[in-house]
């Protein structure tokens, strides 16, 4: 009970043939076969090693302006112009 026997599959096949017709079913199966072939071809292409890229040097870098380095920071930072400084004179 509940098992799918060969007769169940035959009935399902007949119903599909009646609903879609012979032309649609064969067209659908042809599309499935093309998809499987494309998948297999893609897998075969992936397995083959790809041709190595020719030894190319990187493109030359155009020097428009020389790079400047900043001297290391020394001392305390200068107070901001609008900051008030409270000092006791004493």
From Swiss-Prot:
Oligomer status and interactors: The Tat system comprises two distinct complexes: a TatABC complex, containing multiple copies of TatA, TatB and TatC subunits, and a separate TatA complex, containing only TatA subunits. Substrates initially bind to the TatABC complex, which probably triggers association of the separate TatA complex to form the active translocon.
Protein name per the record: Sec-independent protein translocase protein TatA
Pfam families assigned: TatA_B_E
Family, per entry: Belongs to the TatA/E family.
Top-level taxon of the source organism: Bacteria
Gene: tatA
Keyword Cell membrane included in the entry's annotation: yes
One GO biological process term: protein transport by the Tat complex
């Amino acid at each position: 009970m509940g098992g799918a026997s060969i007769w169940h599959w035959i009935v399902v096949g007949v119903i599909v043939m009646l609903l879609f017709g012979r032309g649609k079913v064969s067209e659908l199966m042809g599309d499935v076969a093309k998809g499987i072939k494309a998948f297999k071809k893609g897998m075969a292409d992936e397995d083959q090693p790809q041709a190595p890229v020719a030894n190319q040097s990187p493109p030359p870098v155009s020097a428009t302006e020389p790079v400047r380095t900043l001297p290391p920071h020394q001392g305390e930072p200068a107070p901001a112009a609008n900051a008030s400084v409270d000092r006791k004179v004493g």
